[in-house]
Structure formats: C-alpha cells, structure tokens
C-alpha cells in the first residue's frame, strides 16, 4: 500500500513552525525559501551537525524519580496550631497567675497498687451545661485591707499582678496618683500653651525669583517638550539655546503687548482682538459658538446661514434705534 503523496505547496516534514525564535545552525545562511522549507532542508541534510533530540518535543518519556512505594510518615500538625503561644514567646501573658472563676482545680487522688509517693492528677468530670471559662476576662482577685495601703482601689488595677502578689505595700509613684481621679467641675487641667497657627496660604505662594521666568530657563537635558523659539536656535548646546530662545520669546511678547507708537497716536487695530460675532462675510465652518436666530434657517449652508443671521441682526438694530 503506497502512502499518499502530499502536494508540493505543503511544507515537507519535518519542519519547524513559523515563530520559533530559538537557535538553529546555518539558518541565517539560507536565502530564497520560506521558513518551513528552509528548516525542513536543514533537518534532513546529513551534513549539518545538530542534536539528535528535537527542540519542540522530547523524544523519550520522562522518568519519575520519586518513589511512591514507601509509606509516608504520619502527618503531624503544626505546633503553633496546638499550643496557645508561639514557641520561645517571652512577652506578657495576661492573667497567667490569676485564678479563673469556674475552672475546677486539679485533685490529687492516690491510686491503689501504686508505690507510695507517686500520685496521679486527674480532672474531676464537669457537670452537663457547665462553662469552664467565663465569657469575659475576670478581674484579678484582691486582698482585704489592701485598699487602704494603696490609697485608691484603682491602684490595684494600675499595678496589676505586682500589687496582689507582693505582701509589702507599694510606694505610690509621684505624679501618677492624681491621674486616677476624675476632674471635678470646678477643677480643670492647666490649659495648653498657645500654638502657632498654621498659615495655609504660604503653601500657595510662588517663590520670589530674581528673574520672572527663572523656572522656565532652567532647562534639563533630555526634556522633549515644546520650547518656543527654540527651533531657530542653532550652533549651541541645549541649555544655552533654551535661555536664548526664552529671551527672544519674552522680548517678542513684550513688543506685542506694548506696541511702539508716538504720543497721542491710537493703537493699531491689530492690537485689540476683535469681539464681533456677526460679519457680512459669514463665519468660518466648524464654529461651535452660539449664533442667535440661526436655528430658524433651513436648507442653507453654514456660511449663508451666518450671513442671513448678520442681516437679521442689522434689521433688529435698525428697528431699535
């Protein structure tokens, strides 16, 4: 049985698909054929030294190195999940030495058959519906007669664990005793010294410069923005060219705003911008401003419509005068 012959328009096998950007020997020296035909010729040419392994797909099956025949060790949970604190935690543990209400103490029960001196601590079974821990942290227990030693009941909470463990009365810290009392209505804390008001307006002021456009003249090399009059500056570096261009621009703007004229002569008409909307020539197309009475014109071009609006404006002014 003969194999079906492919048409010569199809790329012969084997070949690399277009878009492969890897290295292939002697590909850069082949000219005149497509990428597929060139790679097919190089793959089938015995004179071209190449690796026997294909680059696009592995020739051999992958080998599994991990051995699944051995039994896995039992899973051990993380230590942080089973203990209340992180290992090596040496910081404060609140209510560590306090007796929590509702938690029954351990009872030492001597068991028969065991040597004397060996006791086994067992927990007494709790009744049904009993809550071993209260829903809120209890206050530390105090000792009777200690309130007069410390002077104020609030100092028990202020000193914490050190107050009820130590038998000797604690010395009151000067300067802290009055903070536990609430101020009376006729007693107030000393007022704070007046602070300097923040002047918000100073952040909106521009710095005083020696030159009015000094910020614009400090050009940075590599700035690709627009600099007026810079296109006509040649033969100098960027920084000096920007300074010269800005000087020329400022001089041109000053002359434009203050035209040269003799005393008593009227300023030229080109100095003041025209504010006339209606013209006999009509407005230019793409004018997006509002033109009164133009909405009443139909089947007319923009120029004819604006001329018609100009005529209506003249008629209106003649009637009002």
Curated annotation (Swiss-Prot):
PANTHER family: PROTEIN FAM166A
Entry protein name: Ciliary microtubule inner protein 2A
Organism per entry: Rattus norvegicus (Rat)
Pfam families according to UniProt: CMI2B-like
Subunit structure: Microtubule inner protein component of sperm flagellar doublet microtubules.
Job description of the protein: Microtubule inner protein (MIP) part of the dynein-decorated doublet microtubules (DMTs) in flagellum axoneme. Binds to the intra-tubulin interfaces.
Keyword Methyltransferase annotated: no
Transmembrane intervals: none
Coiled coil: none
GO terms for biological process, alphabetical: flagellated sperm motility
Primary gene name: Cimip2a
GO-annotated cellular components: axonemal A tubule inner sheath; ciliary basal body; sperm flagellum
Family listed: Belongs to the CIMIP2 family.
